[in-house]
């Protein structure tokens, strides 16, 4: 009898995480910098680097009503913490004052590469 090693299961390509509640009509909206700051608080648990500087955030779309739509990727489709990281990003941004409902959509198009790292992280890693 041999022990069979199974490959990690890829995360669903259409995975979406949501968090937050709608803003009141007269509420002041958060700044783009506040949203980026929240994303920088979310770390990839394997690399211990934040998702923004890793280049995992492809798009931030801040709506007039305070809702925020984010397109995010992972370093690998088989990332064991992928769903949790996407949910953590949604929760972090939704905790910012002036943000309503946050939707984080997963994509692997284009696939992530080290070219997407911030310059600071590239220098730190010697890339």
What kind of feature is each model-predicted range?
Residues 1-127:
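Domain-level signature for proteins that mediate thiol-based redox and metal-cofactor handling
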